[in-house]
Amino acid sequence: AHWMGLHLSEQQKRVILLDAAVALATLHQQGLVHGRPAIRDILWRDGQVLFIDFEVNATKRALSKQKARDLLLFIYNLCREDELSDEIICDVMRKYRECCEPQEWLDMLASVEHYRCIYYLLLPFKSIAKRDLIGIYRLYQNIEQVKKED
């Protein structure tokens, strides 16, 4: 079952997602990537996180780009969830940044900058945006919020 559909408190969601951020950073430190770390692919019990449904085999050649994509997709999937506040999403990003290699965070930020034009191209559609597009808006806004703290 999709745990986001459960009636969890904000604090319970925060704990689960902070644990997931640490687990994703640990996965990346081991030279592994998920491919699409969506909320539905995260199992959690008593602080233990298990990722399921891996989408990609990591190759050394493009590992840094794959890690950056993993992190972006993880954040994007959080941003698509109406039930998650921007505060929780920013806390999760901070936790990943705290646990990852500094270059991994910088690679993700470089990817965001590379595709920034998409954000501006999509802004005129904000008033009619649905879940996927709102997720893109929130992704850029939350990353900017966390970047201000650097």
PLM feature segments, named:
Residues W3-R40, R45, V49, L71:
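Conserved kinase catalytic-core helix
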Residues H2-W3, Q103:
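A short secondary-structure junction motif
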Residues N57-D150:
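C-lobe/activation-segment region of protein kinase-like
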